[in-house]
A protein has these predicted regions:
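Short, flexible helix/strand-to-coil boundary loops that buttress conserved ligand/catalytic motifs
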Residues: 21, 66, 75-78
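Short amphipathic alpha-helical segments
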Residues: 13-36, 73
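Short, well-ordered beta-strand segments in beta-rich or mixed alpha/beta enzyme
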Residues: 1-8, 37-66
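Glycine-rich beta-strand-turn "strand-cap" elements at beta-sheet edges
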Residues: 39-48, 75-100
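Residue-level detector of secondary-structure transition/capping positions
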Residues: 25, 69-70, 79-82
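N-proximal accessory regions
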Residues: 2, 14-19, 45, 58-63, ...
């Protein structure tokens, strides 16, 4: 399962958000075998515009991720930092391709 999370973060909270995101991403990848990739980038000219590439082994792994204490902590801790969130479902064009 592959999807994109597109966020706009409150500029006054950007550094706090990045710290929370770093902790959540590192914990998820370390503890959850079904979380294959969480790769976050910000736009060069709009640093508050963040896109996260999320790759999960399958839908079961994604749903399990949503129930973990570290993800719930991230969501509750950052809810007032995020001005907008768009979750984009995707269809991989080369499904067998792996990120090295």
């Amino acid at each position: 399962m592959v999807r994109l999370a597109k966020l706009v973060v409150d500029s006054t909270q950007l550094e706090n958000y990045k710290a929370a995101l770093k902790e959540e991403v590192e914990t998820s990848v370390r503890l959850e075998p079904g979380v294959l990739t969480l790769y976050a980038v910000s736009e060069k000219d709009k640093p508050t515009h963040i896109t996260i590439l999320e790759i999960y082994a399958d839908t079961v792994a994604y749903k399990a991720h949503l129930q973990t204490p570290h993800f719930i902590n991230y969501k509750t801790g950052t809810k007032n930092m995020i001005k907008s969130l768009e979750l984009v479902g995707t269809i991989p064009l080369v499904p067998g391709m792996k990120i090295k």
